[in-house]
């Protein structure tokens, strides 16, 4: 299992990466916009900090997500993992990007069944929403156990 820090706060990232316990960063356009910075500037700063695996979320319909994912993958190379939502379009994008040898992280995972669909679509990673699972009276850590058995 790998642990990813979900933030766009580069000071926080730098602090936690010094522990050698964090394997990568996930972020999304909303987090980056809240920081008032350009997403690609943030991605480049993270790469310059030595972070090897950055999940870069794409949004929109199938075509928009696929084209943006391909563009980011080409621009940032091995450091880029494209993050897509676990929606019908997101899973289709995952499958197509995976066929293009692009690493994909499927987010908005609330069940083991969704993790199976993401794996079938070629996802390298899945991002379960443990906090929201716990908020809905389920046990989030059980979801992690189920997903780790699958992967």
PLM regions: where:
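Active-site beta->alpha loop and helix N-cap motifs at the rims of alpha/beta catalytic domains
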Residues: 3-5, 9-14, 19-21, 27-96, ...
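Conserved dinucleotide-binding and phosphotransfer motif residues
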Residues: 100
């Amino acid at each position: 299992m790998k642990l990813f820090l979900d933030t766009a706060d580069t000071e926080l990232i730098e602090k936690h990466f010094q522990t050698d316990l964090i394997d990568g960063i996930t972020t999304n356009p909303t987090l980056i916009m809240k920081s008032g910075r350009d997403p690609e500037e943030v991605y480049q700063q993270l790469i310059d900090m030595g972070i090897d695996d950055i999940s870069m979320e794409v949004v929109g319909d199938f075509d928009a997500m696929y084209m943006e994912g391909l563009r980011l993958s080409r621009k940032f190379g091995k450091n880029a993992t494209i993050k897509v939502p676990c929606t019908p379009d997101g899973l289709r994008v995952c499958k197509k990007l995976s066929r293009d040898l692009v690493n994909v992280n499927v987010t908005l995972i609330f069940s083991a069944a969704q993790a199976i669909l993401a794996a079938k679509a070629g996802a390298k990673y899945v991002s379960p929403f443990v906090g929201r699972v716990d908020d809905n009276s389920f046990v989030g850590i059980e979801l992690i156990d189920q997903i780790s058995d699958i992967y």
